[in-house]
């Protein structure tokens, strides 16, 4: 013979007690709503999105979700990634390729020619003063 399983004495309680998932209207209809039960009902309410955009003190403490989001600044929603700016058009890079190498690199060769001409000019003048 098998014995039926008994629930432990410290389990969820008797079946006569209203559960936390019953609605407030059901609890009010039963007449079992006390201030403590109402607070517990509000505490165990599921976190639902709140459409209120106000950040005043009253609205920050409106519900647990508002407190987390507005009061503490914790957002569990997925943030959208920023999109990268599109690369510049091909016309810009093609204009750089039209220029010669010396103009893109800062005219390094013409500077060398200028230095050589200055050196030759100084030699023809007569060198140092003495």
From Swiss-Prot:
State where the protein is found: Host nucleus, Host nucleolus
**Composition bias, Basic residues:** 79-91
The observed outcome of changing residue 59 to A is: Complete loss of P-TEFb binding and reduced Tat phosphorylation
Phosphoserine: residues bearing it: 94
Report the record's Gene Ontology biological process terms: positive regulation of viral transcription
Q: How is it modified after translation?
A: The phosphorylation by CDK9 does not seem to be important for transactivation function.
Q: What is the effect of changing residue 3 to A?
A: No effect on P-TEFb binding and Tat phosphorylation
GO MF entries = RNA binding; RNA-binding transcription regulator activity
Impact after mutating residue 22 to A = No effect on P-TEFb binding and Tat phosphorylation
Motif Nuclear localization signal, and RNA-binding (TAR), per the record, lies over: 78-90
Query: Which residues does the record list as Phosphothreonine (modified residue)?
Result: 85, 89
Task: Tell me which InterPro entries the record gives.
Answer: IV_Tat (IPR001831), Tat_dom_sf (IPR036963)
Coarsely, its chief localization is host cell
Kindly state which keywords UniProt assigns to this record, in alphabetical order.
Activator, AIDS, Host nucleus, Host-virus interaction, Phosphoprotein, RNA-binding, Transcription, Transcription regulation
Q: Where is the composition biased (Polar residues)?
A: 13-25
Q: Can you name a GO cellular component term? A: host cell nucleolus
- Composition-biased stretches (Low complexity): 92-105
Please describe, based on the UniProt annotation, the reported consequence of changing residue 23 to A: No effect on P-TEFb binding and Tat phosphorylation
Main function: Transcriptional activator that increases RNA Pol II processivity, thereby increasing the level of full-length viral transcripts. Recognizes a hairpin structure at the 5'-LTR of the nascent viral mRNAs referred to as the transactivation responsive RNA element (TAR) and recruits the cyclin T1-CDK9 complex (P-TEFb complex) that will in turn hyperphosphorylate the RNA polymerase II to allow efficient elongation. The CDK9 component of P-TEFb and other Tat-activated kinases hyperphosphorylate the C-terminus of RNA Pol II that becomes stabilized and much more processive.
- What domain comment accompanies this record? The Arg-rich RNA-binding region binds the TAR RNA. This region also mediates the nuclear localization.
Q: How does this chain assemble?
A: Interacts with host CCNT1. Associates with the P-TEFb complex composed at least of Tat, P-TEFb (CDK9 and CCNT1), TAR RNA, RNA Pol II. Interacts with CCNT2; the resulting complex is unable to bind to TAR RNA.
- Similarity-based family: Belongs to the lentiviruses Tat family.
Q: Write the protein's name.
A: Protein Tat
Q: Which organism is it from?
A: Human immunodeficiency virus type 2 subtype A (isolate ST) (HIV-2)
Give me the gene this protein comes from.
Answer: tat
């Amino acid at each position: 013979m098998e014995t039926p399983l008994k629930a432990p004495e410290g389990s969820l309680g008797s079946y006569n007690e209203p559960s936390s998932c019953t609605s407030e209207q059901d609890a009010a209809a039963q007449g079992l709503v006390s201030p403590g039960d109402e607070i517990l009902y509000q505490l165990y309410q599921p976190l639902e999105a709140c459409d209120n955009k106000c950040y005043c003190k009253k609205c920050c403490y409106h519900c647990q979700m508002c407190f987390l989001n507005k009061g503490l600044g914790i957002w569990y929603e997925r943030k959208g990634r920023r999109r990268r700016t599109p690369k510049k058009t091909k016309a810009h890079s093609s204009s750089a390729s039209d220029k010669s190498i010396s103009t893109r690199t800062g005219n390094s060769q013409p500077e060398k020619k200028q230095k050589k001409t200055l050196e030759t000019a100084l030699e023809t003048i007569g060198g140092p003063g003495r």
